[in-house]
Amino acid sequence: MALLKEGGLLAFPTETFYAVGGSALDAGAVERVYQAKLRQATKPLPVAAGDRGLLGRYVDFTHVPDVLLRRWPGPLTLVLPAFPGVFPLKLLDREGRVAVRVTPHPVAAALSIAIDAPLTVSSANIQAHNPARTAADIEEALALACGGILDEGPEPEGGLPSTILEPLPDGSCRVIREGAIPLAALASDGVDLRHTEESGLLRY
């Protein structure tokens, strides 16, 4: 994928919606996503990889319960500490954490593995507009900012975006957003869920 390796952007399907993204390790590509989506600079972009081993090079899994790791690949995003100097600063929150998941979608996973890097996976829509479930739903202005649209593989399921949790040192998990994986299902798995003042905030 020469385009992605050179800092370009693609629109591609994920398990939930179409995403617009590029290499999460390339500051120029990250900036282009913000510009294309007219996204607030204070909202970090989520990141996805084709396998957990690839993510393990860049984030710290120390406090992640095994039961959550068994949900990967899947629509579960975890806010984890990033290793220093790896990701562009715009992908990090104030505590140096990044929102990551392992995507089960074969196209998105193959792209990540092909460039040997995580991808930014922000939904393919202008900020505050509806996300795109099909390639035809992608707005023209956003499509023009991408080097291409990959209209192949299984169609995204739509519905809800990924569920977002932040694993904490005491073994519990702060709820950031309930999404495609219901909180009730996670609780039944034994995950200790905590709702705080950050729960429900549109951070990602």
Regions found by a protein language model. Give the residues of each.
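Active-site-adjacent structural elements in enzyme catalytic cores
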Residues: 1-204
